[in-house]
Amino acid sequence: MTVFSGVNKIEFEGTFEGIGKDVVMSQMIRALQKHFPSIRDKNYEFSLFLHIFQRYVLENTSITHDLVCDKIRLPIIDEVVELDDIKNYGLLEGKLLSKLAILKLTGKANPIIGKESPLFEVKNGMSSLDVIVRQTQNLNVRYNSDVPLIFMTSLETESQVSNFLEEHYSSSKVRWKTVVQSSFPQIDKDRLLPIDLQINSHENDFWYPCGTGNLTDTLYFSGELDKLIAQGKEILFVSNVDNLGATGDLNILNFIINEKIEYLVEVVERTANVSNTGVLATYKGKLRSVYYNCLSNESASTCRIVNTNNIWIDLKKLKVLIESNSLNLPIHSSESKITHKNEEIECLQFKTQLVDCIAFFPNSRVLKVSRDRFLPLRTCKDLFLLKSTLYDLDSNGTFNLYPLKFGLLPSIDLGDEFATYETFKIGVPDIPNILELEHLTVMGNVFFGRNITLKGTVIIICDENDVITVPDGSILENVTIWHKSQLEDMNGY
């Protein structure tokens, strides 16, 4: 990519909200050079940001929530391959793993759990990082392989992740490393200029990781892509660090290699516990990711599968696309507010998503996988399920699901009082036994005791001026509770 040195490099037409587009670009370039001189030490980041900003100015690229719902088309179900159909696809050989590398997207702390999210205890004393390293280690030991593990971090997470891994897994059977993705400056929405801070401050409020789509450029410009190819790696398996079911799978790898697939995205059946996650759809003739709440009412009612962000990529094909400047991913722009020098500033952020790369790989596939490959830890209801008796976590980092009485995971609906982990652990200090639970709704000031069992459908809704405490040892089955007196009157709980 070209590092823009002046406005004469760009052709402009029309205006951008009353300001000449050439003026907007020229001002941005001068502001970056003046206020952030050290950005020139990373020419590729300078270029990446200007490339994205230029497209935003010239195209006024659609913001995600401004997509025209009626133009979104869900994929035909026949176009989706089922995991069961590819199991034992040809002869499974452990030596295929010599062609595989695994990468975990670790650029953003979980807003529900907080800055400690990668180190947060999920179950049995293990954090997300413990689980992931042990899963990869188990794969290597089982097949006598050497699958490397890469964590793509950010300015926000790099020191935390690398320090933890160095302390606990410096001598493990997994070759791990971290690669820091690019960060972009927050843009003042009104002035269309970066907030005036020195780049060396790296305050997280003013710098942000620029989305999972940046993985391609980070791998390329860091030299990691060439290193992987030189090591004989052909396929990169990418997933979110908070998806604890995303493991290297020999069946999927075998299918990809035999079919010469260049890009594969895993999807799962949508359930009641999945809210506004990504959905693969066609928009203006191109396959891309949209959020579930962008769908029309008609499409939403027929949407059966959602994106897991488990992605398999052919590394050599990726390099070809990068070097031919072919990956012009859709820009997802969003607005936020930050406080700087006691002044509230409305900001713009520009991100790209890795899943949108699917439109640029000629031989791509969508694979519907089983639910055990999508165990996200994004919300407190996810935490409620994973920490419950429904799941067992073994020493290899594998989650095992107990047989479900109703055939599906229970539907969990928690109110705003349980929105963050800090408030969640106060209201639910001990996860109830939910082996026979079908649905749970909890709203208001509700506090659970210990050794509680929930069965069937349990609804607890507390008035805003009241408090409901579920006593230790309670057994609640097919009940709706509106007032604490109902618990006091119950027999046998």
Swiss-Prot record:
It is an enzyme of class 2 (transferase). Its EC number is 2.7.7.9. GO terms for cellular component: cytoplasm. UTP binds at L105, T106, G107, K108, Q181, G211, D242. SUPFAM superfamilies: Nucleotide-diphospho-sugar transferases (SSF53448). Keywords: Nucleotidyltransferase, Transferase. It catalyses: alpha-D-glucose 1-phosphate + UTP + H(+) = UDP-alpha-D-glucose + diphosphate. GO terms for biological process: glycogen metabolic process; UDP-alpha-D-glucose metabolic process. Pfam families: UDPGP. GO terms for molecular function: UTP:glucose-1-phosphate uridylyltransferase activity. Substrate binds at G107, K108, N240, V241, D242. Belongs to the UDPGP type 1 family. Plays a central role as a glucosyl donor in cellular metabolic pathways. This is Probable UTP--glucose-1-phosphate uridylyltransferase. The lineage of its organism: Eukaryota, Fungi, Dikarya, Ascomycota, Saccharomycotina.
